[in-house]
From Swiss-Prot:
SUPFAM superfamilies: Actin-like ATPase domain, Heat shock protein 70kD (HSP70), C-terminal subdomain, Heat shock protein 70kD (HSP70), peptide-binding domain. This is Chaperone protein DnaK. It comes from Gloeobacter violaceus (strain ATCC 29082 / PCC 7421). It comes from the Bacteria. InterPro entries: ATPase_NBD, Chaperone_DnaK, Heat_shock_70_CS, HSP70_C_sf, HSP70_peptide-bd_sf, Hsp_70_fam. Gene3D superfamilies: 1.20.1270.10, 3.30.420.40, Actin, Chain A, domain 4, Substrate Binding Domain Of DNAk, Chain A, domain 1. Induction: By stress conditions e.g. heat shock. Belongs to the heat shock protein 70 family. GO terms for biological process: chaperone cofactor-dependent protein refolding; protein refolding. The modification Phosphothreonine is found at T197. Residues 598-638 are annotated as: Disordered. It holds the Pfam family HSP70.
């Protein structure tokens, strides 16, 4: 088995790590950074930029720069109306699904496709670092991700050409990294507030056993929401002063979003920051500039309700684990948003103790994923990981009632069955509607899929016995079987319908991703060829100047002609001609260098016995034993 990497596919940033010599190592990307922005851009030239390169050009290309895509993955359009308003690019409806529109590509992309490009970069950078092709990974997801979002994340991996060996919950991964070397038993609470999601998990950790006792969270709460409060505040204040709503201009919105994130980060270290955006828009009286100050106190008041929203999941997790805050030994902070002082103070107030900040909140999840990858590949032994399903799973029964089959916080993998019957006399088929959530009515929960079991022998209502079995694998992904006990007929469904993509969609996207990779490779090769050809032309010109009159006029004319033809081919971007002329010019320059070297060889050769120093002279000049030889005494001075 080759190397398996661990990937934290984040809302804002992503990280890849690997085990080396039994120790987890975070892999720097091609730009030298240990975190890669989860940003993808499509340029006018149809180049695909990923990471820092994409982020840098976002202000100039807001409609084709995709960020915070994790907030849309595996979701239906009706579930993301608030999030869609927070981004500068267009989020469009495709039936009930979500697509992201690129004007430069004139195409709608599924969130999975965009995430796949981020995953592909992470794996490519890891392959270069390790010196071997990486094809397998463990990918993390928020603990509170539902079945659709987990399935969609797995689809993103497949589109990127990665075999996803395991989907692992982010707080669980963080606990793995935190507790790997700990022998004493501890009860820890992992508080994970990232760019787009919030999770809290309680685990018992010690001596290689990691048992999740409960998990809770909010997949609509993260650093992006804090940024948005600053954006709205700045936009509202600017509108009062200038009468212009900057949120209606995509470029201005992108600049505001970047400035808001920067201000939020700065306010973790200082109590006041200045936000200065010159030429943010223009009116009839000329350019307008935004120049405002923001204090930490104002920021905290803007986000007060968001901060309060983290309390309920923490309390829920404690209740589900049947623990009080006094039972918690350590609170581990994960995610960049936990650097906000108000968040740290809130955690301290809720739990009653200072949070443990010994781990890097940006990297700890990827490190834990790498450890889990090591467990699966056999590199790490004596580690037992017992995770849970975050939300209850069940079926819709008569009257639209939600009937749970697997309650939330059940340890996975697991398999549970319930027996149901028909609702009408002579009924020969039943529809199984699979749902996920905590509400009492089925319609208020997440619908994961429907399927029919036909061929039930006619009988009075309530007589047939239909056994419904739920099976959750270690990834937290569900399959359901319905079986009529009398006839033995059964129907199984893997809840892939929960994903927003069909198998055909995924297969098509895999093929497109492979062709894009081929196109990108060709484009890179063309750029390299242009740079090499341009450099060669410059070097050839310089050599002609340096050699001057030593170059025959015929050789000079030939090389100058090749340089001229090569530059014309470069301007036409005729790459076949460029390659041919580059080879011809290389040969001509080589031939000229060889010719000039041979011409200079006789005059530069060492003198023979009849010229210069006589044989056996030891390299001393002068004549042997002649009158011109002067003997001198040598005295050493001490």
């Amino acid at each position: 088995m080759g190397k398996v990497v661990g990937i934290d596919l984040g809302t804002t940033n992503s990280v890849v790590a690997v085990l080396e010599g039994g120790q987890p190592t975070v892999i720097a990307n091609a730009e030298g950074s240990r975190t890669t922005p989860s940003v993808v851009a499509f340029t006018k030239n149809h180049d695909r930029l990923v990471g820092q390169l994409a982020r840098r050009q976002a202000v100039l290309n807001p409609e084709n720069t995709f960020y915070s895509v994790k907030r849309f993955i595996g979701r239906k359009y009706d579930e993301i109306t608030d999030e869609a308003k927070q981004v500068a690019y267009r989020v469009v409806r495709d039936g009930s699904n979500v697509k992201l529109h690129s004007t430069n590509e004139d195409k709608d992309f599924a969130p999975e496709e965009i995430s796949a490009l981020v995953l592909r970069k992470l794996v490519d950078d890891a392959s270069k670092y390790l010196g071997e092709k990486i094809t397998q990974a463990v990918i993390t997801v928020p603990a509170y991700f539902n079945d659709s979002q987990r399935q969609a994340t797995k689809d993103a991996g497949r589109i990127a050409g990665i075999e996803v060996l395991r989907i692992i919950n982010e707080p669980t991964a963080a606990a793995l990294a935190y507790g790997l070397d700990k022998k004493a038993n501890e009860t820890i609470l992992v508080f994970d507030l990232g760019g787009g999601t919030f999770d809290v998990s309680i685990l018992e950790v010690g001596d290689g056993v990691f048992e999740v006792k409960s998990t809770s969270g909010d997949t609509h709460l993260g650093g992006d929401d804090f940024d948005r409060r600053i954006v709205d505040y700045l936009a509202d204040e600017f509108k009062k002063l200038e009468g212009v709503d900057l949120r209606t201009d995509r470029q201005a919105l992108q600049r505001l979003t970047e400035a808001a994130e920067k201000a939020k980060i700065e306010l973790s270290g200082v109590t006041q920051t200045q936000i200065n955006l010159p030429f943010i828009t223009a009116g009839a009286d000329g350019a307008k500039h935004l120049d405002m100050s923001l204090t930490r106190a104002k920021f905290e008041s803007l986000c007060a309700d968001l901060l309060r929203r983290v309390e309920k999941p923490v309390e829920q997790a404690l209740r589900d684990a049947k623990l009080s805050k006094e039972n918690i030994d350590e609170v581990v902070l994960v995610g960049g948003s936990t650097r906000i002082p108000a968040v740290q103070e809130l955690v301290k107030r809720i739990i009653g103790k200072d949070p443990n900040q010994s781990v890097n909140p940006d990297e700890v999840v990827a490190v834990g994923a790498a450890i889990q990858a090591g467990v699966l590949s056999g590199e790490v032994r004596d580690v037992v990981l017992l995770d849970v399903t975050p939300l209850s799973l069940g079926v819709e029964t008569l009257g639209g009632v939600a009937t749970p089959i697997i309650p939330r916080n059940t340890t996975i993998p697991t398999r549970k069955s319930e027996t149901f019957s028909t609702a009408a006399d002579g009924q020969t088929s039943v529809e199984i509607h699979v749902i996920q959530g905590e509400r009492s009515m089925a319609g208020d929960n997440k619908s994961l899929g429907r399927f029919r079991l036909d061929g039930i022998p006619p009988a009075p209502r309530g007589v047939p016995q239909v056994e419904v079995t739920f099976d959750i694998d270690a990834n937290g992904i569900l399959s359901v079987t319905a079986k009529d006990k009398a006839s033995g007929k059964a129907q199984t469904i893997s809840i892939t319908g929960a994903s927003t993509l069909s198998k055909d969609d995924v297969a098509k996207m895999v093929n497109e991703a492979e062709s894009f990779a081929g196109e990108d490779k060709k484009r890179r090769e063309a750029v390299d060829l242009k740079n090499e050809a341009d450099s060669l032309a410059y070097q050839a010109e310089r050599q002609l100047t340096e050699f001057g009159d030593k170059v025959d006029s015929s050789d000079k004319s030939k090389i100058e002609g090749l340089i001229k033809d090569l530059r014309e081919a470069l301007s036409r971007e005729d790459m076949d001609k460029v390659a041919s002329l580059k080879a011809d010019l290389q040969q001509a320059v080589y031939d000229l260098s060889s010719k000039l070297y041979q011409q200079s060889a006789p005059s530069g050769a060492a003198a023979g016995p009849d010229e210069g120093a006589p044989s056996g002279s030891g390299g001393t000049s002068g004549t042997r034993g002649g009158d011109d030889v002067i003997d001198a005494e040598f005295t050493e001075t001490k």
